[in-house]
């Protein structure tokens, strides 16, 4: 019931933002996102904190959302100064410790102005253990947006980095995990990733493309972000390498094999299969004629099972 928006002192927006790809060129689509904000702005009351938690491209809050809200609120003879607009991105880890990952972790935030930032700070202090996990306030909402996108791009690139070393070590029979554990003793390299199936989930598969999309669509710049784009391509192809490893090391042809896949979700202890690397793996194995058996304790399987 959208009428409840009128009663809220704080509205937290966590609506997915659509992005599509044409010839690997990311294109942002704000239509459904702004449509939702239009519904909110039609009911929001004066003095309400509107907190954007969605991971959005740099510049979205200041260049897209703020002007849009100004126009929408104007229809009610209200102004942007009548509400508090802020951005603070999620830092959560879905799974067994989901709630703890919200309360017991550092958060970054910023507001459209100092009053909005203050209201955002006061709200975050009610849900986060800021004594042990102090808040970090940035100078602008664009800086806060950039922090989230850069944070996830760094992680995606770190995962992509290990792919070529996985192939190299495999080709000359090296134990890459043993090598990585030796490297991780050095504190500056403690976050190097282990080999895996690839990147999955809603965030790391798309967030690295937000920067090039924002550069072109929002700021009208021609910064290409080649490294970020390459990381996405490498990660998308990782499951295909696993198929090749199976073909090279199996005594049986893939087309005649019964293969049990244990674990379909993008990470442990969740039921979310969105953009799971396992989906790419299963699809390619089926293309090659394998008979696939799927098992995941967090999912229900049936004739109409769909990845979602």
Role assignments for model-derived ranges:
Residues 1-308:
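Structural/interface elements that position substrates and couple domains in central-metabolism enzymes
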């Amino acid at each position: 019931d959208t009428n409840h928006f009128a009663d809220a002192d704080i509205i937290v927006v966590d609506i997915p933002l659509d992005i599509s790809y044409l010839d690997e060129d990311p294109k942002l689509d704000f239509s459904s996102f702004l449509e939702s904000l239009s519904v909110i702005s039609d009911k929001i009351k004066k003095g309400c904190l509107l907190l954007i938690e969605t991971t959005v491209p740099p510049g979205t809050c200041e260049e897209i959302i703020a002007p849009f809200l100004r126009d929408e609120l104007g229809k009610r003879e209200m102004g942007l100064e009548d509400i508090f607009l802020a951005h603070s991105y999620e830092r959560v880890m879905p799974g067994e410790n989901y709630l703890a990952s919200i309360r017991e972790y550092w958060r970054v935030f910023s507001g459209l102005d100092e009053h909005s930032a203050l209201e955002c700070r006061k709200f975050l202090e009610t849900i986060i253990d800021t004594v042990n996990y102090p808040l970090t306030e940035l100078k602008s909402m664009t800086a806060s947006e950039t922090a989230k996108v850069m944070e996830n791009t760094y992680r995606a690139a770190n995962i992509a980095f290990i792919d070529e070393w996985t192939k190299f070590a495999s080709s000359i029979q090296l134990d890459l995990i043993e090598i990585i554990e030796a490297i991780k003793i050095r504190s500056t390299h403690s976050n190097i990733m282990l080999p895996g199936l690839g990147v999955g989930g809603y965030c790391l598969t798309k967030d690295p493309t937000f920067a090039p999309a924002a550069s072109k669509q929002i700021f009208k710049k021609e910064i290409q972000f080649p490294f970020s784009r390459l990381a996405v391509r490498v990660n998308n192809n990782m499951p295909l390498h696993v198929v090749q490893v199976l073909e090279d090391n199996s005594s049986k042809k893939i087309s005649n094999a019964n293969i049990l896949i244990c674990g379909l979700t993008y990470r442990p202890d969740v039921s979310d299969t969105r953009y799971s690397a396992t989906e790419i793996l299963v699809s390619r194995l089926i293309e090659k004629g394998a008979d696939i058996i799927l098992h995941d304790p967090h999912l229900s399987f049936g004739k109409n099972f769909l990845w979602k």
